[in-house]
Amino acid sequence: MSIDIEVGTKVTVQVPASSANLGPGYDTLGIALSLYDTVEVEVTRSGLEVEIFGEGAEELPRDGSHLVVKAIRSALKAADVEVTGLRVVCTNNIPQSRGLGSSASAAVAGVAAGNGLAGFPLSEEQVVQLSSAFEGHPDNAAASVLGNAVVSWTTVPVDGRSLPEYRAATLEVHPSIKATALVPDFHASTQAVRRVLPSHVTHADAAFNVSRTAVNVAALTAYPDLLWEGTRDRLHQPYRADVLPVTAEWVNRLRNRGYAAYLSGAGPTVMVLHTEPIEEAILDDAREQNLRVLELEVAGPVSVERG
């Protein structure tokens, strides 16, 4: 039997941005970053009210099709609770469709909010599962739920009838590692960027990426001097260069200077993981080319306050 949540119940969620792939770890590696969206949700007597401020405020829907609302309802259904109405206020700082996990953060915020409204009946693993289901892969969502860096994976049932299972394990990132994002002023479609990938790759390229993904994990956790080697990739970035030429140019430029730069998610953001500051002349040049420079820390997990 479902239970109604009392009118006036409120939660505030702060969810970090994320960067996926980290070079070789396609649909597997993710890292949470100190750039946050905030979602405030209150149970009302009836209806749905959605307010949006900040990034995407002019484009995002203000009805039940908003991803945060869909994710809230998904969590409430999983918790077997109901609400009479909702007021949802989104304050977005994560750039939309730039490869910083904006959609995953919205899904995580919604699921975390729904779980908070219900009194936190869902486990961390269930929050990862529900959030990742909106994405179809867990790298971004798991990073935003769990914080730090994650190794994630998807198990597809052999019967073809059950839903995929999304899992993740947290990595404690070495305290010296920072992140700097160079964010272009244009969007990238995840679907369009995925379409350029080949259906088959060579055994040599597959082996190369397996080894570099392992190096990446070692670099993140214990050997940050290996970050450059651990962000090399042959699986997806070379194929995406033609559709993201500005990104590819900056990734190559930075890597040629010894920086561990890579395409963040589906782009177009360029991410650099580093232990020493990036040369200011490079950052100034990026700004002159209309790239937004974000100097970030590794973030902790999504936070939820109920009251």
UniProtKB/Swiss-Prot annotation:
Its Enzyme Commission number(s) read: 2.7.1.39
What are this entry's molecular-function GO terms?
Answer: ATP binding; homoserine kinase activity
Give the UniProt keywords, A-Z. Amino-acid biosynthesis, ATP-binding, Cytoplasm, Kinase, Nucleotide-binding, Threonine biosynthesis, Transferase
Q: Look up the record and give one Gene Ontology term from the biological process aspect.
A: threonine biosynthetic process
Positions of ATP binding: 95-105
List the GO terms this entry assigns under cellular component, sorted alphabetically. Answer: cytoplasm
Q: Reaction(s) catalyzed by this protein?
A: L-homoserine + ATP = O-phospho-L-homoserine + ADP + H(+)
* Annotated pathway: Amino-acid biosynthesis; L-threonine biosynthesis; L-threonine from L-aspartate: step 4/5
Alphabetized SUPFAM superfamilies for the sequence: GHMP Kinase, C-terminal domain (SSF55060), Ribosomal protein S5 domain 2-like (SSF54211)
Enzyme class name: transferase
The main place the protein resides is cytoplasm
Annotated InterPro entries: GHMP_kinase_C_dom (IPR013750), GHMP_kinase_C_sf (IPR036554), GHMP_kinase_N_dom (IPR006204), GHMP_knse_ATP-bd_CS (IPR006203), Homoserine_kinase (IPR000870), Ribosomal_Su5_D2-typ_SF (IPR020568), Ribsml_uS5_D2-typ_fold_subgr (IPR014721)
Could you tell me where this protein is found in the cell?
Cytoplasm
Role this protein plays:
Catalyzes the ATP-dependent phosphorylation of L-homoserine to L-homoserine phosphate.
Return the similarity comment: Belongs to the GHMP kinase family. Homoserine kinase subfamily.
Q: What is this protein called?
A: Homoserine kinase
Organism expressing this protein natively: Corynebacterium aurimucosum (strain ATCC 700975 / DSM 44827 / CIP 107346 / CN-1) (Corynebacterium nigricans)
